[in-house]
Regions:
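C-terminal cap of thioredoxin/glutaredoxin-like
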Residues: 3-6, 12-32, 111, 115-201
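Structural alpha/beta surface segment adjacent to cysteine/selenocysteine redox centers
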Residues: 11, 17-120
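A structural signal for the main folded, soluble domain(s) of proteins
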Residues: 1-4, 84
Length: 201
């Protein structure tokens, strides 16, 4: 029986981006559905004992940079360790992803979410700028005016708030988190365990 993955992301997270292609590949390989939730980690971190990057100790920030470089080199993904527009505003891009998820389906929503992450971490672009976001949407073979108009509906911001609380209720505390049933896998470095779980069916 095909499995379903609930995929909790931050559209600013380098770790989400480092795992982006692999989670798509694993879902395709094992015939799993992949549903993306761009939740608000500004709400999740304080509610779960975490800290946003600027509030972490210098030691933790330095180690994060070292780990990003290790994973960049190991995976061959050319991320910029100090992107110009990090963190970018996630509000509009999240509304676009949620609106597409609910109206056009999971695959296109995942595609746009991953396109936004690539813009931040490889291309030094600012998806918080509506003009830039529109160009990114166009590269996904979508009409940017139509998507941005759809995303302007406040129901998508409300849905993000609901999704964020649901993530907390399920035990999510970091990005990316992959949930298969009630089992949570936190971090792109756990994707090997995700694949094993998918292989079991």
């Amino acid at each position: 029986m095909a499995l379903h993955i609930d995929y909790y992301v931050s559209l600013n997270s380098p770790w989400t981006y480092l795992g982006a292609q692999r989670i798509e590949d694993y879902a395709a390989k094992y015939g799993a559905t992949l549903r993306v939730f761009p939740v608000d980690f500004g709400t999740i971190f304080p509610a779960s004992g975490g800290f946003p990057l600027p509030k972490r100790s210098p030691q933790r920030r330095a180690y994060r940079t070292m780990e990003l470089q290790r994973w960049r080199d190991a995976l061959g993904i050319p991320i910029n360790l100090e992107p110009k527009h990090f963190p970018s505003s996630e509000a509009l891009s999240s509304s676009c992803v949620i609106a597409l998820r609910e109206t056009a389906g999971d695959n296109v929503a995942v595609e746009v979410a991953h396109r936004v992450l690539k813009a931040v971490w490889e291309e030094d672009l600012n998806p918080g700028d509506p003009e830039v976001l529109g160009r990114l949407i166009r590269t996904c073979d979508l009409d940017p005016k139509a998507v941005l108009a759809l995303a302007a509906d406040p129901q998508w911001e409300e849905r993000r708030t609901t999704d964020t609380q649901a993530a907390l209720d399920r035990g999510v505390f970091g990005a990316p988190s992959y949930m298969i049933g009630d089992e949570i896998f936190w971090g792109q470095d756990r994707l090997g365990f995700v694949e094993k779980r998918l292989a079991r069916g």
